[in-house]
Amino acid sequence: MSIVDTTIKDHPYQLVLVYASKGCAYQELVADLKKLLLSNITIIVTGDFNFHSKERNALTYFLVAKKMLRQLVNWPTHDEGRTIDHCYVSKNARVQITRYSPYYSDHDGLCIEFEHFPW
């Protein structure tokens, strides 16, 4: 499991990149995210979660029910037909998400663009 957290001073958004290996302990990931995620800021949590986006677990419960984020990816992102690359954003975030399929990967790439910059 890996997490990269990026916040830029004086800009009200936080980008968190996640790689969750297969079978990772979601409770540990939730504990790490609880420490990282800020309040009163636009949040984007995205990455390779290695479970189908429709699966319910401690991580999806925390991001959707507790942090009130919405999952934007609703198409298969892996060659096996599952949606394992997710993008959770704050409800107030006005973003556009598109996919692209690099030839060198078994995952689709996600391109996240702000429709309206929050600063």
Locate each region found by the language model.
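A shared catalytic/ligand-binding motif for oxyanion handling
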Residues: 1-119
